[in-house]
Amino acid sequence: MFKIEPHIEFESNKNTAYYSLFWSQLEKADKYKITTSVPSVSGLYEIYYEDAEKRLNLLNVAIAWLGGLRSQIRSDIDSDGKSDEVKEILETYSLYYRYTISPSFDSIKDVAWFLNKTYFKDASMSQHSGRFETIYVKEFAPDKIHWV
């Protein structure tokens, strides 16, 4: 496993955006560890749960902007106020998270849109920035968990 700093790199060519997404290491979700280790800056994160067969299942891809990654991830792993289906998952299974950092809201929106479209086949879950006709994302993760 190699150590990388989570961040998003960006290049463009005419109406096409090319993003390189560098994830943090996947960590077991614990609100106290999140408080001390996750930065309170803007970025993008994923929440996973480990099912009974010990497989990781992607639960959520989300943007953290004004509240920062720390508060958003903590809020997302808290079962209070969630639907019954999500609440059951949060209370039953082990949860994991990873994140990346970016100061650019447009870049975060583009990458979140691409990941939601790719993972969940639903581009309506988020909106891209509108700057490009085509968006590509390549993922890099220290623990080799890649979905695209």
Feature-to-residue mapping (PLM):
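Boundary/linker segments flanking structured domains
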Residues: M1-L59, I63-V148
